[in-house]
């Protein structure tokens, strides 16, 4: 019986540690930004705040073609144009900072945005 209690205590400790790891572990999140929304040449949302290591998915929603170019940061830019509705690409931000981006074909129409990486 004593051996069973020792084994039970160990299981409880392991379970508690797993719970702590689950809730306090470093987790990267994915965020989606739509390119073109409700008939407008916009990024939706146009401003977001994420953590270092988070991935942003840019999805062509409507009114193609779109791309996403980050000023002074070609490593985060996606110059290829997305033509098909639903077409998407992912960008993972691995450095803290403020990043301004635009859709090159529609920047003059105000299709710009910003990502704050903490």
What does each model-found stretch correspond to?
Residues 2-10, 15, 21-118:
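Extracytoplasmic copper-binding redox domains, predominantly the cupredoxin/blue-copper superfamily
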